[in-house]
Amino acid sequence: VNRNELAGLLERAADLIEVLGHGAYRAQAYRRAARSLERYEGDLEELARSNFAGLPGIGPALAPMLREIVETGSFPYLEELEGELPPGIQELFQVQGLGPKRIRLLWEHGIDSLEALLASEGKLRELPGFGAKSEARLLEAARFAQQSRSRFLLAEALVAAQSILLDLEERKLKAALAGSLRRGLETVGGIDLVVLGSPEEVREALGKHVKAQEEGVLRGEVEGIPLRIILAEPPTFGTLLVRATGSQAFVQHLGPLPEGREEEEVFEALRRPWVPPFWREPEHLGLQPPAPLARNQLKGLIHCHSTYSDGTTPLRELALAALQQGYSYMVISDHSQTAAYAGGLSLSDLQRQWREIEALNVELAPFRILKGIESEILPDGSLDYPEEILTRFDVVLGSLHSHLQLPFEEQTERVLKALRNPYLKILAHPTGRLLLRRPGAQADWERLLEEASQQGVVVELNGNPHRLDLDWRWALRFRGALNFSLATDAHSLEGLDDIEWALFYAQKAGLEAGQIANFWPLERWQHP
């Protein structure tokens, strides 16, 4: 496990401790330890060998348990907690708006699963802390969670798939990703593979992951994700890979598929150029694939968070990491003052950060840190600081974090007002969605993106695997009218690698380097 995964396990344990009523102090201790781990930037294995010596919040009671997790990958205490709860309780954590305290309240009133929650319409409003409106919001979130529970984030499914591919590779079995995972849809229903081998060979390689066999197909599961393995013979491996990758509309568009050992042979026989898997969606039919976008040609790191707000990395370390990764400038964008939940910056915080930025710009020249902010778009559409403060930023990003359930017209007017604010440069993660967790704000996005184009506002493609917002389909539709920025939205050094996801979805949207703000020279920000 890495430090963020370890912190996540501690947070999970703290949640279950609260639901079970095993003591608020114990839950708080686990959360303090999780925060401390998130801020730690050193080597986790070395820290474990030292029994977490000197790390705030981790004392002699927790240290041996954490060391065991690092060394073995198992967390027996968490398994014990999970065993004390009805299985359905785990699902309730997927419902937006439900935390441990509310889940405990629901459990005390006999609501111990998603199905039980959905069947409680008219009853929830009678519980302490609930009313008719909160009941309606919770039931809407529960329906969304129910629709999402058979889906998995692309990034998580890809990690699980890579472990299976390694097992097959060790047995010298040729294998390739297929399906929506290979095409790079943001959420997937499972892992599809095409494998050159017999059922016996694959079973021997994958062991318990294979559960069933059909004609030419093995089925199973890896880390809770459904697994489908399509068995191929050498002459038709490429043909099966094209068909299994899809999309169905793309395969139908190709017509009858000839035999081919590799995909390239299939396309050559069809007298068509090979099409990269990310460009095989129905939305791409009839369109030419874009030119590749290279990470090493990016000039600007845009949208990241430091310890001034809710990031875990000090500003100087973040700048040094950006410099080391080849960027020539960085737009720091900590949260604005209204975002108290995320350590939003007060006016005095801004002054402190600006002084540090000015000093670092001298120290690290010609690398430059631009004074940015991720401003809350307030419910009335205004930005989060007075004009005399907004004018002092180099780059103002505006984003939605709250009031995502405003009525359609009201939400549209809210974002329209923000887009017309002369200080707004970037509309960040526009809809505010969290994949499989909550839908984005409902608004007239066609009208809003047209307005962004007219106002010259850059629209963000957020690379956080939980967001991937703006949706690539909207970006594809507006690729001829808008400029875009690629964001890591990094809250840690590891988060800087999420630029890979942003680059991938920029390609899936057919974007060119010239319309992507991260490829722009510094001067374009200073003299728009």
What are these regions (language model features)?
Residues 177-179, 371-373, 463:
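Short loop/edge segments at beta-strand edges and connector loops
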Residues 14-21, 146-150, 400, 404, ...:
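Short amphipathic alpha-helical interaction patches enriched in hydrophobic/aromatic residues
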Residues 2, 22-25, 58, 84, ...:
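Catalytic cores of large soluble enzymes that bind and process phosphate-bearing ligands
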